[in-house]
Regions:
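Aromatic-lined, polymer-binding surfaces characteristic
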Residues: 94-95, 116-123, 127-312
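Surface-exposed, short loops/turns at beta-strand junctions within beta-sandwich domains
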Residues: 36-43
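Short strand-edge motifs at loop-to-beta-strand transitions and within beta-strands
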Residues: 31-34, 64
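Low-complexity, Pro/Ser/Thr- and charge-rich linker/hinge segments at domain boundaries
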Residues: 67-94
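Extracellular fibronectin type III
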Residues: 51-72
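Solvent-exposed loop/turn segments flanking beta-strands in beta-repeat/beta-sandwich domains
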Residues: 1-21
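Short beta-strand segments within Ig-like beta-sandwich modules, predominantly Fibronectin type-III
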Residues: 23-29
C-alpha cells in the first residue's frame, strides 16, 4: 500500500476532488488520516498516494467512497496541533489531569477508605531488595511492577521514602548492563514503566546525567515494541488485544514524557492521538463504555486527559 516514506490522503464530496472542495492531508508517516471535523451528510470520496522524503508523490490510488447519514453518532477531536499546545510543560506530567487533586492529597489521603491498602502495597515494595541484585536487569520487570505501588504512594502522600526506593531501582539499572530479556514485550513494558514514572515523579531529584541516561535507555527499549508508528501495524490491524491493553499506554507515556524535547517522542505521541481518534468511534466505547479490543482503562484515562487539555 505505502510505496514511499509517507502517505497523503484526499477527502472530498466531489468525485473529481476539486481543490476548493477537498480536504488534503499533509504527507503522513502512518496509514490513517483524521479530518478532525464533522463531515456533512452525503457521499464522501477519498484516495491516497505515496510521497517520498523529497516531497514527490506517486499517482493517486483508485477512488473509494462512504456515506454519512444523520443517524451516525458524532465525535470530533481537535487537530493534534491544538492538543500539543496544551501539553504540560513541567514535571510531574503523566497524570496532569489529576494534579490539582494530588496537591491536596497529602493532607487528606489518610482518611480515604483505600489509603490503608495503598500504603500496604507501597510498603511491600519497600521491603524488596531488587536493587541489590548482582544482575539488576534480571529483576527489572519486578521493579517495574513494584514502581506502580511506589509511584502511587509517593504522589498521594509525598512521603520521600517511596521516591527513594524508585530512585534506588533506577540507579541500580543505570549502573548495570541490559540483558537479552529486553526483547520481551511484557518485560520491556515493566521497565519502561519504572523509567518513565521515576523520571516523572523524581525529575528534580535526578542529576542531569541520570536523566540523560534514563532517556537513552527508554528509547533503546522502546525500539522493540513501542516505537512502531511508522510500521503501519496497529492502524491496519483489526484485533490486537495486547497492544491496546499495555503497549498503547506505554507508548503514549513515553511520547508524553519527551515530546517537547525529542522528535521521535513527538511522533509517537501524535501517532497515539491519531490512532485513538481513528479507532474510538468504531469501538462504541464512547457511547457504552465497551472496548472490543480489550480492557478500556487506558482509554478512559486518555479520554479524560485529552478533554482536560483541549478545553483549557
Amino acid at each position: 500500500m505505502r510505496k514511499a516514506a509517507f502517505l497523503q490522503f484526499a477527502l472530498s464530496q466531489d468525485p473529481n476532488f476539486r481543490e476548493d472542495r477537498t480536504i488534503l492531508s499533509k504527507p503522513l508517516p502512518w496509514c490513517m488520516f483524521n479530518p478532525h471535523q464533522i463531515l456533512e451528510e452525503g457521499t464522501w470520496h477519498w484516495r491516497f498516494r505515496s510521497v517520498d522524503k523529497a516531497g514527490k508523490g506517486t499517482a493517486w490510488s483508485q477512488n473509494y467512497s462512504f456515506t454519512v447519514t444523520n443517524d451516525i453518532p458524532q465525535i470530533v477531536t481537535p487537530p493534534y496541533a491544538t492538543f500539543a499546545r496544551n501539553l504540560p510543560k513541567g514535571y510531574p506530567r503523566l497524570y496532569c489531569f489529576m494534579e490539582e487533586g494530588l496537591k491536596k492529597a497529602p493532607a487528606t489521603i489518610r482518611s480515604h477508605p483505600e489509603s490503608k491498602e495503598l500504603v500496604h502495597r507501597a510498603n511491600m515494595a519497600l521491603e524488596t531488595e531488587f536493587e541489590t541484585s548482582p544482575e539488576p536487569y534480571k529483576v527489572a520487570g519486578k521493579m517495574g511492577q513494584m514502581t506502580n505501588f511506589l509511584y502511587t504512594a509517593y504522589r498521594s502522600t509525598n512521603d520521600q521514602i517511596y521516591a527513594d526506593k524508585m530512585l534506588a531501582y533506577v540507579r541500580a539499572l543505570l549502573a548495570s548492563t541490559p540483558n537479552k530479556m529486553l526483547t520481551n514485550d511484557f518485560y520491556c513494558g515493566d521497565v519502561l514503566f519504572l523509567f518513565t514514572h521515576t523520571y516523572d515523579a523524581c525529575y528534580n531529584q535526578l542529576t542531569a546525567g541520570e536523566r540523560e541516561q534514563i532517556e537513552e535507555s527508554i528509547f533503546q527499549i522502546a525500539r522493540y515494541h513501542h516505537n512502531i508508528q511508522r510500521k503501519g501495524t496497529e492502524e491496519n490491524h483489526i484485533f490486537d488485544n495486547h497492544y491496546w491493553q499495555r503497549a498503547f499506554r506505554e507508548m503514549l507515556q513515553v511520547g508524553l514524557m519527551f515530546a517537547d524535547r525529542k522528535e521521535t517522542a513527538s511522533e509517537m505521541l501524535e501517532y497515539c492521538y491519531e490512532l485513538w481518534t481513528a479507532r474510538a468511534p468504531a469501538s462504541g466505547f464512547i457511547r457504552d463504555g465497551e472496548w472490543h479490543n480489550g480492557r478500556i482503562s487506558s482509554f478512559l484515562r486518555l479520554h479524560s486527559w485529552c478533554y482536560e487539555l483541549v478545553i483549557r
